[in-house]
Design a protein with these regions (language model features):
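Beta-propeller domains
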Residues: 1-281
């Protein structure tokens, strides 16, 4: 998703809304012909990016409905093709693959997580599969050709009591988090706490820097409760995890996965990772 601020976005959308429908279809067709062979379900990606600026389109276009073609073209202008491994591919970490089928005796299949550094030196997480043979030789499997970005799902329902407990562990002052949480019900959504937090940050220029940092820690905690999901028809080597929250915007890296087996026999993989927002690691 390529976004350089609301003012520029409004000007760009206004120009696209001013185009006639034939021009829109012609330009969209040229874009799809050039890029559809390099990306899976590119129209889905374009529509997803359109939805992120749809509120601006509604503000600028009160009377006329926007066609599907025009929505996709708007999505094009908020999409940036990015070479995720153009600068480096390094810092591997290995964990046992849950799928150990179709192997020869003495072989073990593993999943390797890596730090991929692309244009602008923004880091993301990528994966490869490999086989370790009986002689401890590592045989890398060929990665997929297409790359799939995770869909971010923010459907977590926060419990105020538990959220406050976490903030206390983080030593966020009670007089600070009460400015946000006192406005919320006992159960609240991500959108609710984000709106309350940002309104306090953006609407109070007199807020001292130490209190502003404490308020941003509230949003950081809310951002940490995020799920991502990939399409089932993607190979593991085609999946990339980009920075998601504003506190990861300069890169996420060095994931270290560990397999845990629960008492009921089910396995789950946990990982620590490093994130950077340009100021704080």
């Amino acid at each position: 998703f390529f976004y350089l601020g609301e003012e520029r976005a409004r000007k760009l959308i206004s120009r696209i809304l001013a185009m006639d429908e034939e021009e829109v279809r012609l330009l969209l067709g040229q874009i799809l012909r050039e890029f559809s062979t390099r990306h899976r379900s590119i129209t889905t990606i374009l529509m997803r990016h359109y939805q992120k600026v749809a509120h601006l389109v509604q503000e600028l276009n009160h009377t006329e409905s926007v066609s599907e073609y025009r929505k996709l073209l708007i999505g094009c202008y908020f999409t940036m093709e990015y070479a995720i491994e153009s600068a480096a591919l390094f810092n591997p970490s290995v964990v046992e693959d849950p799928d150990q089928t179709n192997l020869e005796e003495g072989q073990k299949q593993v999943i390797i997580s890596l730090r991929a550094t692309g244009e602008g030196h923004i880091s993301s997480l990528v994966f490869r599969r490999a086989i370790i043979d009986r002689n401890n030789e590592i045989i890398m499997q060929e990665p997929g050709f297409l790359v799939d970005e995770a869909e971010v799902v923010r459907d977590h329902l926060y419990l105020k009591k538990r959220f406050v407990s976490k903030l206390m562990e983080m030593e966020v002052p009670a007089d600070i988090y009460s400015l946000v949480l006192d406005k919320l019900p006992e159960e609240f959504t991500y959108d609710q706490i984000r709106e309350c937090t940002l309104s306090l940050i953006n609407g109070n220029n007199q807020l001292p820097i130490n209190k502003r940092v404490a308020v941003e820690e509230i949003l950081w905690l809310a951002d940490s409760y995020t799920r991502i999901r990939f399409s089932l028809d993607t190979d593991l080597s085609e999946r990339v995890i980009f920075p998601i929250s504003r506190y990861e915007k300069n890169g996420i890296e060095d994931a270290r996965f560990v397999k845990f087996t629960n008492d009921n026999g089910e396995s789950v993989y946990y990982a620590t990772y490093t994130a950077y927002d340009g100021y704080t690691i």
